Amino acid sequence: MIYIDNRQNKIKVDEEFENKIKEIIDYALKEEKVNIDYEISVIFIDNNSIKEINKDYRNIDKATDVLSFPMLDYEEGEVFKDVYLNYEFDESDLDEGNLVLGDIALSLEKAEEQSKEFGHSFLRETCYLTIHSVLHLLGYDHMEEDEKAIMRQREEEILKSFNLHR
């Protein structure tokens, strides 16, 4: 189950766009071998809102593109398919039978700015940021160079296999 809540009014969001975001989330999860019913919440916000969240949770007082709030715990270097592939989840991890993976806060305003900066479509940028965030929910990180290389490779592989190119 994917919940989308549009809390901004700077970028037009229609059902087709929301469905594409749901499709890329589902696709990325399948690519990462998530073989259980799941729940992810996505909020679309603007730069001011994501700046506030970034300051509150990361103590960084500036707008960013996307923030991820994973609900599962991972040791450094471990990802979902390494730890939870055949795991028996406790009821506390589930909501009405769905594994709660976490929340995504995506600034559509920042995504639009970046799509222009990088010279590709808004859809490609939002799909990339969504994949990036989903991978964070699954334990990927980019704080260390080796982790960053692995995460970037997975992002590009998923984008290409989903037929979204730069």
UniProtKB/Swiss-Prot annotation:
Gene3D superfamilies: Metalloproteases ('zincins'), catalytic domain (3.40.390.30). It comes from the Bacteria. Its cofactor is Zn(2+). Keywords: Cytoplasm, Endonuclease, Hydrolase, Metal-binding, Nuclease, Ribosome biogenesis, rRNA processing, Zinc. One of its GO terms (molecular function) is zinc ion binding. It holds the Pfam family YbeY. The keyword Chaperone does not apply. It is an enzyme of class 3 (hydrolase). This is Endoribonuclease YbeY. Zn(2+) binds at H132, H136, H142. It is found in: Cytoplasm. One of its GO terms (cellular component) is cytoplasm. Its EC number is 3.1.-.-. The keyword Phosphoprotein does not apply. Single strand-specific metallo-endoribonuclease involved in late-stage 70S ribosome quality control and in maturation of the 3' terminus of the 16S rRNA. Binds 1 zinc ion. Belongs to the endoribonuclease YbeY family. GO terms for biological process: rRNA processing.
